[in-house]
Amino acid sequence: MERGRNQLLIAILLASACLIYCRQQYVTVFYGVPAWKNASIPLFCATKNRDTWGTIQCLPDNDDYQEIPLNVTEAFDAWDNTITEQAIEDVWNLFETSIKPCVKLTPLCVAMKCNISTSDTTMIRTTTPSTAKEAPISDNSPCIRTNNCSGLEEEKIVKCHFNMTGLERDKKKQYNETWYSSDVVCDNSTDQTTNETTCYMNHCNTSVITESCDKHYWDAMRFRYCAPPGFAILRCNDTKYSGFAPNCSKVVASTCTRMMETQTSTWFGFNGTRAENRTYIYWHGKDNRTIISLNKHYNLSMYCRRPGNKTVVPITLMSGQRFHSRPIINKRPRQAWCWFKGNWTEAMQEVKQTLAEHPRYKGTKNITDITFKAPERGSDPEVTYMWSNCRGEFFYCNMTWFLNWVENKPNTTKRNYAPCHIRQIINTWHKVGKNVYLPPREGELTCNSTVTSIIANIDERDNQTTNITFSADVAELYRLELGDYKLVEITPIGFAPTSQKRYSPAHGRPKRGAFVLGFLGFLTTAGVAMGTASLTLSAQSRTLLAGIVQQQQQLLDVVKRQQELLRLTVWGTKILQARVTAIEKYLKDQAQLNSWGCAFRQVCHTTVPWANESLTPDWNNMTWQEWEQKVRYLEANISQSLEEAQLQQEKNMYELQKLNNWDVFTNWFDLTSWISYIQYGVYIVVGIIVLRIVIYVVQMLSRLRKGYRPVFSSSPGYIQQIHIHKDPEQPASEETEEDVGGNGGDRSWPWQIEYIHFLIRQLIRLLTGLYNICRNLLSRIFQTLQPILQNLRDWLRPKVAFLQYGCEWIQEAFQAAARAARETLAGACRDVWGMLQRIGRGILAVPRRIRQGAELALL
């Protein structure tokens, strides 16, 4: 019983010691953890287009991009998104570069006399709505071949003339000009004699406008965005994602986005890459803005044409200035128009049904009360009309007939095509301003586009009706194209508390690990537990570094090939900036690890205690990304503590290195050591001199306290006289006057010699006193601590005895177990050996038994 209690006490003591030792947690640095954070840096583009803009602005695309699935849940937002914002800005720059208005001039703000006739002002003749259902036109309709479909008439134009000076000195010149009526604003009064009206250009309120300096085509271009090394692009692959919420549970990682088209249009999105066999809606998180992706099953498309032929002649205004306008020669241009192919009716019904089932939608569920609606009149033409670009020309289409046809409104004109006109002065879609472009080029203009999305605002009205109002926000197109992406910065450095403390391990040969090709390979462990991911940090960190180096090399190669073309462009600067950003990130990570003393280590234990003991990771169930989100607010403090600890360790190592120099005898004779010795000697001499002065002053003060005494007097008790007798043979006549009053033949040594002996005695007395004081102080300290030390020895003696007894008991138990095992093994071996002997004798006896059996058979 007593022995069991002792064993229990030993176990409790060992457990207590382990708990005391293991309670302290230290910061451990892990390199290569699969974690990230949101980033906002310039991306670079890659394209296969070999036109001028694609060659100058982007790098060649090689289609070598893979997506790696991640078992994580991540938040995405199509509106608060770095990639979409950069795409909007870059496409705007592309738009300005391709259809470049590059000359700024003062608007033509002179009074013009214009002749507005009835025939000139006719754009769409007023027609009486027919109750009979009109068949939609198709590819085989005769009016398509003849450009003479019902309702399409000539453009609305105005003929004007005005006077200006400046071309010749002190002379006026009259100019004749033809304008689209939408570009001028006229007074209500008309001169009855000439039938002319005073008109002005409608942009005269703008102080400065920009005119196109050359005619360009706006051809479709496909390009993708790529992240620089050290960064990644995450994509939401969840069909429930609606642009804002809920969080995406199916995430994949890549280095580049999908290919996307350069789109610039209102109302509809054309040639998008997000079309699927379903209709889905991206809804803004705070207002009613939406972007609706149409089902590609319905094959929706739009075909636009500007028939006719004309000649454009510029006019010269003053010296050296030219203003391009539209004088028409021989024939006025026919009106442009667009017709819509595909099953639009069913596609729009599916849009309504999808809206009614959307979780953000709170309006009526009856799709008959959900209608498509054009924006209110009175706003910019780009809002009122559907604005698109066809081969560099800007089409403004009146969609009234089309909406009547889609909604099947009774007593209205319903057609699957829309009349359009081309404008020379347009409002910019990304920045506030106006651009003046060249007149349309000669010849017929045609373009064919696939309709993939609708830009709309959802207007709910008292839960009874809902209007899907078409919008002119061109930027929404790129929120649909790239809204399922987000840019993240890989943060391979992680912190976590462990019970391990830093030590200095022996440098051994590093073990080889399996090399995994690719930068994003280590992100495959993003969805596994922290403990499992930590076991593969060596391979992950090598994958990370190798991938960064590989990406850097690939980016450097393509930049070198394109450097002559990229030199003077804005996007070329962005690409170089992306590469510099990647290098800065890599060097920053390595410098940070080095400042913590963790360079070239995958798991680095430190001496910094973990500050928040209540915050500990769940190594079996928590991912590194979840853990990093919890401790991200501690990173600054942890980093500062690690730097301070590393500085202190370097200081300690320096001091230790200085002490190590004393164990080598030859270092004692080093020149720097001798200089130190001389310094120490000078300090000692100066100290002795100061001490002597202090002692002398103290002695003088002590003697002055006893009464006045001449400084150089010598009392019998102070200086012992040494008598010296004079030579008796010296004549008495040699005595001088100075000998009078003396003691006859006695003389004494000077007092300075005795004073030196006095100082020596005083110094010895002082040192003896200091020694006695120190000895008494140490004796008293030892006497004070002796009871405490005695109690500590008395307390430790049984504990040590218990530990010794426990160790002896464990040793005896091991010996008994070994002895029992040895005896058991010996017995088993004897039994096996006996069995083998019996089997052997039986085998050897087989011939004898056969012979005996044969003998018995013969008898």
Curated annotation (Swiss-Prot):
Residues 1-24 form the signal peptide. Residues 304-337 are annotated as: V3. Pfam families: GP120, GP41. A motif (YXXV motif) lies at residues 708-711. Residues 513-533 are annotated as: Fusion peptide. Residues 702-859 are cytoplasmic. Residues 160-204 are annotated as: V2. Residues 726-745 are annotated as: Disordered. A motif (Di-leucine internalization motif) lies at residues 858-859. The record marks R512, G513 as: Cleavage. Residues 658-679 are annotated as: MPER. InterPro entries: Gp120_core_sf, GP41-like, HIV1_Gp120. A lipid is attached at C774 (S-palmitoyl cysteine). Disulfide bonds join C45-C58, C102-C213, C109-C204, C114-C160, C226-C256, C236-C248, C304-C338, C390-C447, C397-C420. Keywords: AIDS, Apoptosis, Clathrin-mediated endocytosis of virus by host, Cleavage on pair of basic residues, Coiled coil, Disulfide bond, Fusion of virus membrane with host endosomal membrane, Fusion of virus membrane with host membrane, Glycoprotein, Host cell membrane, Host endosome, Host membrane, Host-virus interaction, Inhibition of host innate immune response by virus, Inhibition of host tetherin by virus, Lipoprotein, Membrane, Palmitate, Signal, Transmembrane, Transmembrane helix, Viral attachment to host cell, Viral envelope protein, Viral immunoevasion, Viral penetration into host cytoplasm, Virion, Virus endocytosis by host, Virus entry into host cell. One of its GO terms (biological process) is clathrin-dependent endocytosis of virus by host cell. Glycans are attached at residues 38, 71, 115, 148, 163, 176, 188, 195, 205, 237, 247, 271, 277, 288, 299, 309, 343, 366, 398, 411, 448, 463, 467, 612, 621, 637. Specific enzymatic cleavages in vivo yield mature proteins. Envelope glycoproteins are synthesized as an inactive precursor that is heavily N-glycosylated and processed likely by host cell furin in the Golgi to yield the mature SU and TM proteins. The cleavage site between SU and TM requires the minimal sequence [KR]-X-[KR]-R. It comes from the Viruses. GO terms for cellular component: host cell endosome membrane; host cell plasma membrane; membrane; viral envelope; virion membrane. Residues 397-420 are annotated as: V4. The surface protein gp120 (SU) attaches the virus to the host lymphoid cell by binding to the primary receptor CD4. This interaction induces a structural rearrangement creating a high affinity binding site for a chemokine coreceptor like CXCR4 and/or CCR5. This peculiar 2 stage receptor-interaction strategy allows gp120 to maintain the highly conserved coreceptor-binding site in a cryptic conformation, protected from neutralizing antibodies. Since CD4 also displays a binding site for the disulfide-isomerase P4HB/PDI, a P4HB/PDI-CD4-CXCR4-gp120 complex may form. The surface protein gp120 is a ligand for CD209/DC-SIGN and CLEC4M/DC-SIGNR, which are respectively found on dendritic cells (DCs), and on endothelial cells of liver sinusoids and lymph node sinuses. These interactions allow capture of viral particles at mucosal surfaces by these cells and subsequent transmission to permissive cells. DCs are professional antigen presenting cells, critical for host immunity by inducing specific immune responses against a broad variety of pathogens. Some HIV-2 isolates have been described that can infect cells independently of CD4, using CXCR4 as primary receptor. These isolates may have an exposed coreceptor binding site. Some of the most genetically diverse regions of the viral genome are present in Env. They are called variable regions 1 through 5 (V1 through V5). Coreceptor usage of gp120 is determined mainly by the primary structure of the third variable region (V3) in the outer domain of gp120. Binding to CCR5 involves a region adjacent in addition to V3. This is Envelope glycoprotein gp160. It comes from Human immunodeficiency virus type 2 subtype A (isolate CAM2). The gene is env.
